[in-house]
């Protein structure tokens, strides 16, 4: 179970309610540092740090994409898989409106709005993942099975090397 000193974010509330076994990982946040900074600060492989990306389709419907920290999303391939013309990243303001989180502190847990979640398939085979806990400078770690149990993401293969 989580330590009592966890920040109380909507993500942490959902993780506790779902009885997810997670560990806190606070780190010094750097503006525009991304997953390379969090991986470095925590001493973990960037491939195991999962970024939460808020995107929208050509009908302006939002969706969540979970991707390895060292990969980018092929939006063209994602659009093809989900059957839309295009998928694009949301603006920071739009992402915050849908999730309730600031960019850099976006978690797929406890979002303001329910959205479909697409997860890069390779995330499921990792031993442990590190994902944002709903605050800048705060990741939580868990097994991919816990994430899958709670979010029930749709597996996709859309990751590309930057």
Which ranges hold each PLM region?
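Extended, low-hydrophobicity, polar/charged segments
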Residues: 1-162
């Amino acid at each position: 179970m989580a330590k009592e000193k966890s920040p109380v974010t909507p993500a942490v509330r959902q993780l506790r309610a779902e009885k997810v076994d997670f560990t806190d990982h606070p780190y010094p946040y750097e503006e525009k540092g991304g997953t390379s900074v969090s991986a470095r600060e925590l001493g973990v492989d960037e491939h195991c740090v999962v970024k939460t990306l808020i995107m929208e389709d050509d009908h302006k419907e939002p969706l969540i994409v979970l991707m390895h920290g060292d990969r980018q999303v092929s939006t063209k391939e994602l659009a093809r898989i989900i059957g839309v013309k295009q998928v694009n990243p949301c603006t920071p303001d739009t992402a915050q409106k849908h999730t309730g989180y600031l960019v850099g502190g976006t978690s797929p847990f406890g979002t303001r709005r329910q959205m479909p979640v697409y997860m890069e398939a390779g995330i499921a085979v990792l031993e442990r993942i590190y994902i944002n806990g709903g605050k800048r400078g705060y990741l939580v770690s868990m097994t991919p099975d816990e994430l899958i149990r709670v979010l029930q993401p749709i597996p996709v293969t859309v990751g590309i090397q930057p």
